[in-house]
């Protein structure tokens, strides 16, 4: 009764806590709905009080626990934001939705499974005997070797380079040998020996019992020594210690005999202990636990887990008992569990320190379990039954992921005796009469399948920061929305602008609830991002041509009034116009259009003034109605072949901190800046000869493919000054820097020393008492323009047209046309994509600070993302990933830190953004990322001051002959040394006056031999009248050379020999004075 009462009390307590959580959840929903109503009414809500999705999701997790799924909460939150008056059911938080997919069809879809069974590879063991089966498979990860041993004595080593047959069953790490076991012997094989390696092995025998399994204990601290663990049919675990001296490994190669040698097992150090009452089926050494494990068919002593010291004594050991014993076991390091399986068909999970009861059970096999392996990276357990049925389990959730069966082979090939998992190649390997290899599905998808998100080329890619979703549009006019965290598709829209109408542009508003699309025929539609429902439409005009009004760019503007939408659009003909949408009208209308200013700037004018229109409007718009103030005698050219190149190709917008700018780039390389504060439009840059037709250059050589404003708000500038970062990739994702567009910070005056800007900034607002920290924000610097050109150059400009940086990004091939630009919210990094599929990552954090040093603009990384042209590149700050879209029809995901491939949208496998996976490349990319390392300041050559220098004059004075006679005989135990070089060193002579240089070479003789002196002899002198030389030498030699004492003896016998030698060496005539005149000193 006490137990029942306690259970009832616990259930009552749980129900009470759940009711309290539901009440708090209802209050949270009411508060969120009220806040969304206030936002729609136009009321200002502070950022600290705003309930965004991240804050809402954190509150729900706090109420109901971390098991609430992100997708379900996001769906509920989107529904609440779209309709605040709708009834909210708390069951939706827990995913109470009807699934449209068939679970059976999803299970049968092979690409959703773990292993790709249809891609299985089979290797036939050539040379094997009939009915021979593989009994053991061992993987050596660091050498990438695969060792197999058959029942009838054939041992094979597989690798990716060598296909020769050698013998072995496990690998001796220190001795670099392969060890194998037979029923009564141990074989140590030198598979790398010269000559016939098949005959160079050692046999250790006899053994007391029949050996059934073997493993090697890794001993990294002991050189030239390995320990071998053996399990036999008597239940004993044996430990053999082998050294290099036992096999003569240290002998010379000439003395080494290539023959079979039988060694006595009694000569080896070995210990054994009986741990089981039946056969030892498997033995393994677990390095993570610093102990070994052995399993047996014994029901009482099924699994033993102990250190190696327990083999030398009789102390109790850790034993795990299970019915009918265990055939196999393995250890999972991350989960810290031991997985066992045996004849009772149950997989048990044990904690290494709890041997009384398993922590979990996996039931599903219909036959005895023969092998178990683990995939540490994916936390999977793969079990194999004697009927060749494979089951893949998730070790964390204990759920079944996949079941497959090996149906190949005849009746004699039924049993699979061994199985391993190769973590290096992501492959499951089994051994029977053949060797089968099952690759992981993600390995095939990532490396062998061409990524494709759409069937056609991608036209548009957008990222919704509010919902963390990606929108893609292809040329077949299919809109798809994807989850960034998982890569799953949320919904799709077919033919959004009608049948056979291509969508060419799109944009997402600042709140993330709406997105607009523009088509080839000039129509514009506004959609609800959460549901994909169409809200408003701009119909096609009656007099429009087919491609004249094709929309190239859409930008959402911040509306001055509530319940209205404003979109800035760029048409293919270069027209920039504004489209308005009202709440009570389903049709959009064009309310504003910029005049064409390019022809007026062609004749050399630098700027054109604007006149504000006096047209009255019922509502305020971000840009006023303007007209060009031009001279009356100006005539616009009509038939000019360069007029097609004057069209605007790309635009960007800056409306923050008092700036109201539109930048445009044309096909002929002209940069135009519309400034609605100063009422001017000016030509920032114009290339030379851009208005003339040059047959040697491509017509689009000066084309600007993309243009972008680089502006750092005061809040971001303060954050950049506090965070000493070298790149934007090191920015903390939890801080969540906000977008600079539509900021409500205080406006500061902009002044640049040394140059006068024509940008007028509004008056400074009074300091807000509620936000005193705003007054301490640093002053914002003027914006910078960056342009991506057709010639492959990346150029940065001031608003006055001064070139700050002209850079040719470093890729495999130079001068590749750039197509897309992107920067983060705090303008710390700059991303660029080109037509060959490369992504360029640059650090501009320090470059934006005056005086804009060119050396601070640094390219950090470059990698090949696609084989074809990239049309859009996006950087996601909170995840530190890069999104790339290409005309090859795929949208791919990359790590921004190193350029490693994560996956593509449309794949069946979920994304793993937080987990660092192995480096892989898509099948259509073969180039590795290039990291541009900065030259360290410590690598500069250092100048040393030498205290002494070599003096040649001292060296000449100290001749070897004079030193020979001045040298005193050394004493006993004293080394005789000559310090002539050290005596020739002296302090450097510093000249107070510079040396005078002069030219001595003879230019007529040539520069090589022109500096040599040339002498001419008028008539040769007769040799018999030449004066004799050597008189002084004979005088010196006539003096008796006194013998010097050496070891107490006088040397007088060598004097005549030295005198005669001197006579032979000294010349008897003086020829130097005749051929070489005396040179005055």
Curated annotation (Swiss-Prot):
Q: Basic residues composition bias: which ranges?
A: 1043-1060
**Composition skew (Low complexity), residue ranges:** 726-745
- Alphabetized UniProt keyword annotations: Repeat, WD repeat
Q: Which SUPFAM superfamilies match?
A: WD40 repeat-like (SSF50978)
Q: Where are the WD repeats?
A: 102-152, 153-198, 199-265, 266-314, 315-356, 357-400, 401-444, 445-488, 489-532, 533-631, 632-740, 741-803, 804-857, 858-895
Name assigned to this protein: WD repeat-containing protein 64
Which portions of the chain have biased composition (kind: Basic and acidic residues)? 746-756
- Name the PROSITE patterns for this protein: WD_REPEATS_1, WD_REPEATS_2, WD_REPEATS_REGION
Ranges where the record places region Disordered:
726-757, 1036-1060
For the keyword Thylakoid, the answer is: no
> Which residues are in coiled coils?
none
Q: Which organism is it from?
A: Homo sapiens (Human)
Query: Which PANTHER family does the entry link to?
Result: WD REPEAT-CONTAINING PROTEIN 64, WD40 REPEAT DOMAIN 95
Record bears the keyword Repeat = yes
Q: Which domain of life is it from?
A: Eukaryota
